């Protein structure tokens, strides 16, 4: 999604699995002024957290130039990882506070790389609490997961 330098892009993301771990879907809606773009995808074997990270990474990777971004997520894992935990992980060579390797390391790297050129405000919203855009991305992620489950087992999808 193209934007003017300094323009504000609003992004809503969601990811989920049923069961967790299991088949999962992710989705994002990007809004720049009156323009909107929906993105979604799914994987057969994944986790809620992996789908949340994938949604954020894919949305940020879709931006064609540096932007101001408000990214809305109902994932405390994503928001806390980006705003609080990742500096410690990097300092400890991608180990958590207990000394174990950080889960989903490659996806955290992808999110951080995609976020780097942008000025991002990470906004947590309560899931399933009636926020219209959060409900929309939840429905898109669920639809992506359900569509993938109707396909042959060797495929995963990414609809962009």
Swiss-Prot record:
Residues 5-146 form the RNase H type-1 domain. It comes from Acidiphilium cryptum (strain JF-5). One of its GO terms (cellular component) is cytoplasm. One of its GO terms (biological process) is DNA replication, removal of RNA primer. GO terms for molecular function: magnesium ion binding; nucleic acid binding; RNA-DNA hybrid ribonuclease activity. Its main location: cytoplasm. The lineage of its organism: Bacteria, Pseudomonadati, Pseudomonadota, Alphaproteobacteria, Acetobacterales. Its EC number is 3.1.26.4. The gene is rnhA. Belongs to the RNase H family. Its cofactor is Mg(2+). Monomer. CDD domains: RNase_HI_prokaryote_like. It is an enzyme of class 3 (hydrolase). Endonuclease that specifically degrades the RNA of RNA-DNA hybrids. Binds 1 Mg(2+) ion per subunit. May bind a second metal ion at a regulatory site, or after substrate binding. Mg(2+) 1 binds at residues 14, 52, 74. This is Ribonuclease H. It is found in: Cytoplasm.
């Amino acid at each position: 999604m193209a934007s003017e330098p300094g323009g504000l892009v609003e992004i809503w993301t969601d990811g989920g699995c049923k069961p967790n771990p299991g088949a999962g879907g992710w989705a994002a809606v990007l809004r720049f002024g009156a323009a909107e773009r929906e993105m979604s995808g799914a994987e057969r074997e994944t986790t809620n957290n992996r789908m949340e990270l994938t949604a954020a990474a894919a949305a940020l990777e879709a931006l064609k130039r540096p932007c101001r971004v408000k990214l809305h997520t109902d994932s405390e894992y994503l928001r806390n990882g980006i705003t609080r935990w990742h500096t410690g992980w990097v300092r400890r060579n991608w180990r958590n506070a207990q000394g174990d390797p950080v889960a989903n390391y490659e996806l955290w790297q992808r999110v951080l790389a995609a976020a780097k050129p942008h000025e991002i405000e990470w906004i947590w919203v309560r899931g399933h609490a009636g926020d219209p855009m959060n409900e929309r991305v939840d429905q898109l992620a669920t639809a992506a997961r359900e569509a993938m489950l109707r396909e042959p087992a060797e495929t995963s999808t990414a609809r962009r």
